[in-house]
Each structure stands twice: as structure tokens, then as C-alpha cells.
Amino acid sequence: MEFRRHFTTKEWLILQASPIWVGFLVAAADGHADPKEIDENLRQTIRAATFSTGFTKEVFEDHVYMHLNDDDALSAVVETLDPLEGLKAVSILLGKIPASEAENFKDTLRNMAFKIALVSDGIDKNEEAAIKLIDLILDGQFNLPFYY
């Protein structure tokens, strides 16, 4: 729990929700969420919890734990925030940790987005646009009027 202490409970839940929002944005980009994309999101989330280090591992481990225990708090955050607003909040929150940890986390989310899009017959132009939008938001280059 090295990094957890830097965030409020709500902020930590927002960070944990980020893989769900990334998966949703990519899967829905082509008009429908393919079951293969949903499965890949879960696979990539578990992979990040298992093989990552530092902040990324801590967030993804907590995400998996909350998901396995059907925690209503995580569900409430996911349902309350629009995915774009949620990722904007994530971008802001990453300013509380060392830049190297923040970059590793963003790279993990980007990798997830790419793999989710790739799993169902390759990446189409809408999924490519969704991935670019995710990149811009995570890098703080896409300004959304949002206050969490």
C-alpha cells in the first residue's frame, strides 16, 4: 500500500475504474462490444495485476480484488462518471505520483486499449480514433470540463 496512501478512497476507486473505461471506449467504438473484446479486457487487467510493478500493480490488484468481490463502490464510480470524464480524472490524479510510475500506468492502459481493439478482426478506424482519444486524455492534451 505504498501508493494508496496518496489518494482519497474516491480517487483510488477512480484509478481502479480506468481499465473498465478504456475497455468500454475501445469496445464500443465500432458500435458494439464484442464478447472477445470484453474477455480481452479482463485478461489484460489480470495480466497487469500479475506482472506489473509499483503503482500499476497496486491499482490493478485492487481492481481485481474489488471485481472478484462484487464491490458496489467500484461499480458506483464506473456508473457515475462518463468514461471520458473518468479518464480525465485519472490523468489529473496521476500528478500525485512520480512521473515514471504515472507513465508506466498510462502505458499499461494504452497497451490494453490496443490489445482489446486487435482481438476482434483487427483495429478499425473507429477503434483507432478511440485509442488516440484515450492517449490524448491520459496525456492531458484533451481538455474536458470536469471536476471530480
UniProtKB/Swiss-Prot annotation:
Top-level taxon of origin: Archaea
Protein keywords: Plasmid
Protein name as annotated = Uncharacterized protein ORF11'
- Source species of the chain: Methanothermobacter thermautotrophicus (Methanobacterium thermoformicicum)
